[in-house]
Amino acid sequence: MTSAARPRVRTRALTGTLAAFSLSFGMIMISGATPASAATWPTPTNSQPVSSTISVSGTRDGGMVRYYGSGALAGDDQEEGQDPIFKLANGATLKNVIIGKPGADGIHCEGNCTLQNVWWEDVGEDAATFRGGSTYTVTGGGAKKAADKVFQHNGPGTLNISNFAVSEFKTLYRSCGDCSTQYTRKVNLNNIEVTGTGSTARLVGINVNRGDVATLRKITILNDSGRKVVPCQKYNNNDSAGTGPDSTNCLYSSSDITYR
């Protein structure tokens, strides 16, 4: 599920026109929407190859351009140690971006960061990795075709994910199970649309032996009559330690999960 730590502290374990902007949200809005049907994915305004990682400080508005890896960033599988398309400095915001195929290692947040209305069309190694800081925010957007994880949490702190759509994935969020330096981590999921495929998938994977806490609210799961999507998977590092809600680590109730 995760992989051994590396010196780069990496383990395997988001303005176009108003019309384009509205289309990109579909059912997943920055605030206030309740997912009811599969999200409408945005149409890119342009496509741009990226052969070396783009560093972001402050705010970068991608204008709904599709960025995809080329050259050294042409990897899109689960090979470890890939570089990201974007690397965000502490406090940076990336918004209105589509990451296409090849996706390399998506986005790295080196500190606190905000990903707003970012869409991953075909997740590479991971969609985003949170490496340092205390608070990370993912709001709006979506991800699909993740052979393993969407969001990898290696650093400390809390990741807040809201108004997000995910499909064709194995794990939406994973707290690192084998990083060389470990932390107690928190993740909050709110207003998440999940499309099942009939295969086993997990919304969150947390390390209960480290005191991790996952809070799930307003989760809508589509196309999962067999209940293959596990809301909260517990681990002792990399060893499975059960599933389901409790009063300590996996904070949700049946009323927080809607199946359609």
Regions found by a protein language model. Give the residues of each.
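Eukaryote-specific detector of the first structured module of a protein
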Residues: 60, 79-89
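Extracellular beta-rich repeat passengers
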Residues: 39-54, 59, 64-78, 107-124, ...
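C-terminal region of N-terminal signal peptides and the immediate post-cleavage residues
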Residues: 25-40
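Parallel beta-helix/beta-solenoid
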Residues: 91-99, 116-118
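General secondary-structure propensity
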Residues: 24-25, 135
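Beta-strand repeat architectures
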Residues: 87, 91-92, 108-112
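N-terminal export and membrane-targeting signals
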Residues: 1-21
